[in-house]
């Protein structure tokens, strides 16, 4: 490695994930040296609570690193090497509607899947495109690592609208599952695994998992998942109830195709009736997040600020943050590390549309992602992927063309919506709810 130090901007500085990312950057500062750390958010008040706590963290652990929090795009995006984008357009108020409106109609209400994911996607596209434009204007040589949801729709939009931008779309969900896999087979973490995986974001399958010696771990993993899903028993005692349910339900998703291991989000598409029956339309995942994660993170920020020290902080590194830092390091030092990303298919999955934005292993280096070939999708997976990818493309069509019909088609095609009349009822309600965020549909 050389003597370079990097300037990093976290766009969406008020996110509850920000302290974990900061802590991870500081923990890995020998591997990925920093000269400057900046936060950017359009909600200055929310960001400031996080920033004041994180500034204490930075000053105590790496006083040589310059720290800045701002709501000014020019100040934020000037002189940066990496932008970590984690915005939520409409905040939790809109996420709550994304979940609760479909549930009123007996349809899965979820942040990134189904009608809720489509609604969120339409809000997110201009927000992420705006960040890309700021980066290209003020730091044209920077890389953006985008993990703003819904990643699949955002990735399709950036492919079309900013095809030459230095943006890498990523998601931490498979990473978290792989850490669980490592625990199931008694390994330290996901970095001890060598894997093959393919699909769309929140919509994929592992076809092979091995350790570094080449030992096939699939038989042991399948035996465990068939009985327990990805639930880790006593190790999950502090895990939120909705996630425990999701990890356990992976056993039923696995049963549909015992030749692979599934992403947990497939439960929404394959068992929507079960999901709706086990949902409370008056208390959804948003309410759980606000009661648990939001409260915990902001209480801890306030405690650090009041104490004037972060020496005894409860914040810690997590899958989400470690993955992002590993990716920055791979690009900065051209390591060719193998990691998952959402990229144009271009033959990676042989029998899927070459323009589809697929999630596959890539080698990361100074020029970004080099996708690896995963062969052909099986018939079951091919059918699911093709349908869902068309939903994502129609959503971006709707944005580009400001088309009500395209958005209705997207919701009608979505596997978890029973028919076009229900899709229209949900859509009409969502048009009103999103009037301040969506383009005016014709």
Curated annotation (Swiss-Prot):
Domain of life from the UniProt record: Bacteria
InterPro entries found in the cross-reference section: GlycHydrolase_4_CS, Glyco_hydro_4, Glyco_hydro_4_C, Lactate_DH/Glyco_Ohase_4_C, NAD(P)-bd_dom_sf
Regulation: induction: By maltulose, leucrose and palatinose, but not by maltose, glucose or sucrose.
Reaction(s) catalysed by this chain's protein: alpha-maltose 6'-phosphate + H2O = D-glucose 6-phosphate + D-glucose
Entry cofactors: Mn(2+); Co(2+); Ni(2+); Fe(2+)
Residues under site feature: Increases basicity of active site Tyr: 111
Family label: Belongs to the glycosyl hydrolase 4 family.
Cited PANTHER family: 6-PHOSPHO-BETA-GLUCOSIDASE-RELATED, MALTOSE-6'-PHOSPHATE GLUCOSIDASE
Record-given protein name: 6-phospho-alpha-glucosidase 1
Source organism of this protein record: Lacticaseibacillus paracasei (strain ATCC 334 / BCRC 17002 / CCUG 31169 / CIP 107868 / KCTC 3260 / NRRL B-441)
Gene responsible for this protein: simA
């Amino acid at each position: 490695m050389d003597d370079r130090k990097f300037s990093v901007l976290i766009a969406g500085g008020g996110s509850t994930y920000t302290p974990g990312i900061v802590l991870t950057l500081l923990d890995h500062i020998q591997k990925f040296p920093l000269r400057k750390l900046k936060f950017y958010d359009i909600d200055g008040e929310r960001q400031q609570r996080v920033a004041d706590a994180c500034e204490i963290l930075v000053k105590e652990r790496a006083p040589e690193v310059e720290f800045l929090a701002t709501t000014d795009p020019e100040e934020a995006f000037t002189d940066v090497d990496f932008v970590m984008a984690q915005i939520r357009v409409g905040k939790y108020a809109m996420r709550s509607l994304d979940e609760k409106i479909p549930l009123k109609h007996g349809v899965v209400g979820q942040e990134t899947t189904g009608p809720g994911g489509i609604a969120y996607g339409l809000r997110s596209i201009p927000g992420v495109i705006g960040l890309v434009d700021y980066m290209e204007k003020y730091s044209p040589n920077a890389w953006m690592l985008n993990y703003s949801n819904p990643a699949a729709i955002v990735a399709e939009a950036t492919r079309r609208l900013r095809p030459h931008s230095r943006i890498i779309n990523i998601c931490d969900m498979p990473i978290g599952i792989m850490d669980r896999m490592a625990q199931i087979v008694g390994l330290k973490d996901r970095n001890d695994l060598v894997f093959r995986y393919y699909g769309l974001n929140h919509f994929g399958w592992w076809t092979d998992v091995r350790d570094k010696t080449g030992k096939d771990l699939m038989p042991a993993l399948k035996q465990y998942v068939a009985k327990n899903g990805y639930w880790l028993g006593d190790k999950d005692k502090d895990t939120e109830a909705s996630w425990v349910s999701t990890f356990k339900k992976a056993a039923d998703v696995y049963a549909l195709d015992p030749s692979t291991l599934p992403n947990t989000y497939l439960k929404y598409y394959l068992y929507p009736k079960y999901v709706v029956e086990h949902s409370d339309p008056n208390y959804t995942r948003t309410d759980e997040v606000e009661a648990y994660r939001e409260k915990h993170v902001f209480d801890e920020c306030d405690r650090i600020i009041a104490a004037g020290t972060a020496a005894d902080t409860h914040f810690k590194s997590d899958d989400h943050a470690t993955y992002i830092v590993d990716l920055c390091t791979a690009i900065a030092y051209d390591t060719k590390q193998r990691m998952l990303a959402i990229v144009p298919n271009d033959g990676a999955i042989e029998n899927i549309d070459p323009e589809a934005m697929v999630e596959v292993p890539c080698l990361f280096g100074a020029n970004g992602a080099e996708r690896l070939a995963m062969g052909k999708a099986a018939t079951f997976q091919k059918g699911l992927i093709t349908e869902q990818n068309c939903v994502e493309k129609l959503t971006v069509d709707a944005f580009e063309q400001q088309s009500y019909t395209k958005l209705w088609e997207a919701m009608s095609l979505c596997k978890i919506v029973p028919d076009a009349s229900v899709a229209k009822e949900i859509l009409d309600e969502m048009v009103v709810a999103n009037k301040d965020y969506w383009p005016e549909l014709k």
